[in-house]
Amino acid sequence: MDTIKIFNHGEFDTIRNKLVNLLKVVKWNTINSNVTVSSTDTIDISNCIREILYKQFKNVRNIEVSSNISFIKYNRFNDTTLTDDNVGYYLVIYLNRMKSVKTLIYPTPETVITSSEDIMFSKSLNFRFENVKRDYKLVMCSISLTYKPSICRIQYDNNKYIDISDSQEGNNLCYCVITMDPHHLIDLETICVLVNKSGKCLLVNEFYTRFRKNHIYDSFADLCMDHIFELPDTEELFTLRNDDGRNIAWDNDKLESGNNTWIPKTDDEYKFLSKLMNIAKFNNTKFDYYMLVGDTDPCTVFTFKVTKYYINLNYE
């Protein structure tokens, strides 16, 4: 999320009454100060908050909600009662949305954001409350978010979604959008392949038009020789190599030998591929360069721009 998120659709209405009821139990413990409560009741409330936040944020791997809930009475809140660092977020929930209490947040010394809605903001920001005087009108708790390294999610079938990531970790296939620099031996402009962790390449589409036949090559160099250059039987005369010993999709320490590759077979799988193609078509600003060298004299160098989308599919 950004440094500030305002919840203005009553996202926390379901737990507002729980907080009011909790306040009835603990209010007598203090007269003129903020009070922080931690109990089995606050653990239940924290779990409810966590479930609500999971629905609000995409690509979140983990959400931690502190079971310490602070009821705020003064305009200025001494945050040392909540946390001793500035990592993560504060969540402010108003006990009564009809009151005139406001949260004032200062992203910069010259800028102030004012809200009367439930709000979540980075602990690194300066803030204060306005019109918090005679009674407890809001609560605060500490939130920690851990995000997946994910670009988006695509529906795979009726019961499953697949994360599309720019990270190799935890994934077993890479969808590569490959754009070739102009060369007199190359007629294609863009080609897309699925590369598994052994380096095998499934030709998916060219010019963003999907292939129906499943063409699988042992390496990207083989794919180039057979499909791009159309020189399948000239290995004795002309070969391709990457001088750095790199794979087009995977770091060398991620490569595994002998892996089968995923092949689309069902309508759901072909629909998934089509969705992946569309995502890649409009989200390809980040790319790496990959070069293949032909053993001519002098050497022929082919340069490719590669945008990579990592996924994890279960297959045998």
Swiss-Prot record:
Top-rank taxon: Viruses
Keywords: Early protein, Host cytoplasm, Host nucleus
Subcellular location: Host cytoplasm; Host nucleus
Keyword Transmembrane helix attributed: no
Induction remark: Expressed in the early phase of the viral replicative cycle.
Record-level GO cellular component terms: host cell cytoplasm; host cell nucleus
Pfam families xrefs: Pox_C4_C10
Protein family: Belongs to the poxviridae OPG031 protein family.
Protein name (database record): Protein C4
The organism of origin for this protein: Variola virus (isolate Human/India/Ind3/1967) (VARV)
